[in-house]
Amino acid sequence: WARRCGEESGMMSVDMGGPVNKAAYVFGTASIAAGNYNIMAAVMIGGMVPPIAIALATIFFKNKFTAEERKAGPTNFIMGLSFITEGAIPFAASDPLHVLPACVVGSAVAGGLSMAFGCTLMAPHGGIFVVPTIGNPLMYLVALVIGSFIACGLLGLLKKKVSE
């Protein structure tokens, strides 16, 4: 199950709001209807990681982003914490070969950890605003932090320095 949820979480990062992302989201919401709440927890965390990781990377790896990207980076904290994956799209569009793999790995790790920690979610959306509805919320936040920092670290390793 943890591997499967890691896959669903990774799918949330593949196209950042596109059809693969939506397929994972629909699977998560259908799981709620079926009474399986851990899949939705993994799906939501997978959608939260990319924008949070990008926001972190624009702070820790400033030389890997343009001035415009660094300025836009912190907005992704708010979007990520709100489960709005689409904040990561401009960053993924400008460097898909480096941004997407980093985000997919971070999301998959976060989702797998969420599942391994037994986290559940009965709400289909909401990010940090639905933390009170999350089963095992502390470990959910731990999984979110770990996945976000893994993706952030990979962004620092994979992205090339930007010359302005």
Language-model region placement:
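Short, small-residue-biased leader/transition segments that mark boundaries at the very start
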Residues: 1-6
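Pore-lining transmembrane helices
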Residues: 7-163
